[in-house]
Regions:
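Mg2+-dependent phosphoryl-transfer enzymes with acidic/Ser/Thr/Gly-rich catalytic loops
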Residues: 2-10, 27, 188-270
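A general structural motif
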Residues: 5-8, 41, 65, 105, ...
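Active-site residues of response regulator receiver
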Residues: 14
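Residue-level signal for inorganic ion chemistry
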Residues: 17, 37, 48, 72, ...
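Active-site phosphate-binding/coordination module
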Residues: 23, 28-126
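Hydrophobic packing residues within well-ordered alpha-helices of enzyme cores
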Residues: 30, 55-59, 165, 169, ...
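Short, structured coil segments at secondary-structure junctions
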Residues: 62-65, 71-72, 173-175, 229-230, ...
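Conserved acidic, metal-coordinating active-site core of Asp-based
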Residues: 100, 104-107, 111-217, 221-229, ...
Length: 270
């Protein structure tokens, strides 16, 4: 058994591919491990690309309290709904994304507040509904609607996002958007000034913790800043090579309860 360098008082967990199995289920072992961590005085938070309503079931299942990180770091909000930090996408940039998606015949979701807006109920919208367990709302014209600033935009591609789409959009909207992917079907866009790592630092500061007292676990490239910010980091066994390369430890895959392994073997042994 190997302990972490400093006692962990804050643990940030990615959701999709980390906490949630492919069946969108959190195993009983992971639930017990999170409960044990909380009982030991560790504040556990979600650091997810999801919006609050799409993560509510997970928050309730794990009985989490306090601040959580949503929208890939664009929103930090308590479980009671108090916003601690939020940076949206500029309306003009959001409208440009919608125009681009229309020309390319791609489906786009716009996230305003805690609601998903779409122009049509396409198969991609249905995929979004099933993944998030939230019903998208239809508007006639997203370009006009997005005179208000969205927190996040997502281009949804089925069966998966084409290779090269994420870097292509990152180049096209350089300086205007941060582009990443948390699930194979999503190309996610947020304000370029935000990421999960920055949001984690904000939470640690609110809680009066040093980053050496913070641990984080994730699997995707959008988790890299999260792991880089934490004093101790864990990459899931199903994680990307770049995430594994920067992590302090590599644990089991999501199907093998990697989050529970990180807590049992390292966090609670500190």
């Amino acid at each position: 058994m190997s302990a972490v360098g400093s006692k962990v008082r804050l643990l940030a967990c990615d959701v999709d591919g980390t906490l949630l199995h492919g069946s969108l289920h959190i195993s009983e072992r992971v639930q017990r491990a999170v409960a044990d961590a909380r009982a030991a005085g560790v504040h556990v938070l979600l650091a997810t690309g999801r919006m609050p309503s799409a993560a509510r079931r997970i928050v309730e299942t794990l009985e989490l309290t306090g601040p959580q990180v949503y929208y890939n770091g664009a929103l930090v909000q308590t479980v009671e709904g108090a916003k601690l930090f939020e940076v949206p996408v500029a309306p003009g940039v959001a409208q440009s994304v919608v125009r681009y998606a229309r020309e390319a015949k791609m489906h786009v979701n716009a996230y305003v507040g805690d609601t998903i807006y779409v122009e049509r109920l396409t198969p991609e919208a249905e995929f979004t509904r099933q993944l998030n367990r939230v019903d998208p709302q239809v508007v006639d014209d997203l370009v006009s609607f997005l005179e208000r600033a969205p927190t996040k935009l997502v281009i949804v591609r089925l069966p998966t996002v084409e290779e090269g789409l994420v870097p292509s959009l990152a180049a096209r909207f350089a300086g205007e958007l941060s582009v990443s992917s948390s699930v194979p079907q999503y190309c996610e866009m947020v304000n370029p000034s935000v990421d999960k790592g920055r949001a984690l630092r904000i939470v640690a500061d609110k809680l009066g913790l040093a980053m050496s007292e913070v641990a984080a676990i994730g699997d995707g490239d959008n988790d890299r800043t999260l792991l880089e910010a934490a004093g101790t980091s864990f990459a899931m066994g199903n994680g990307s090579p770049r995430v594994k390369a920067l992590a302090t430890h590599v644990v089991g895959s999501v199907e093998d309860d990697g989050v529970a392994e990180a807590i049992e073997r390292y966090v609670l042994a500190g």
